[in-house]
Amino acid sequence: DLIWNGYRPYGEVPMLVNPQSGFVFNANNQPYDATDGPDNLRLEDFPISMGLQTDQTNRSLRIMELTDGIAKNDRAALLAMKFDSGYAKGSQADKVVAAVLSHDWSGEPEMEAAAEHLAAWDRQMDKDSRHAALGGLTVVHEITERFTKIPAPEPQEAFRQAVAYLKTHYGRIDP
């Protein structure tokens, strides 16, 4: 069943056509999350032999955060989505930050202060953000692990490394 002997006929491929919201997207995400409205395709519509990607990318999570399935997306809204530099709630980055912030840093004043700084991060990677460097360096290994095949350190260790890097190279954690 997993060996392909040909192509699936076009008419048998699950399709999302003219969704209620009028908005279809693909951000290298699972195909059953392709619109911001209520009429997405369903996982059970796809045969397992199709070998679909089943994880969500941060881009697709952010698109779903930035749209509501009701409001019209004008040119400005589409450009804002295209150039968005944020991490989504529930993304890998968000989970790493949550793990770091759940740790008790009270025995290490420098790390406790850094954790307070990280807690103020709005998950945006804007160039003017005083929190983005610490946040980005804390989450980068977890996010890139599946591509680099380099095991990511535990969140607390990644955070320590980020703090050390910024202190060494910039003399501060908020360059």
What are these model-derived regions, one by one?
Residues 2-4, 24, 72-175:
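Acidic, low-complexity N-terminal propeptides/linkers enriched in Ser/Thr/Asp/Gly that mediate export
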Residues 1-70, 124-127, 138-148:
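Hydrophobic alpha-helical segments
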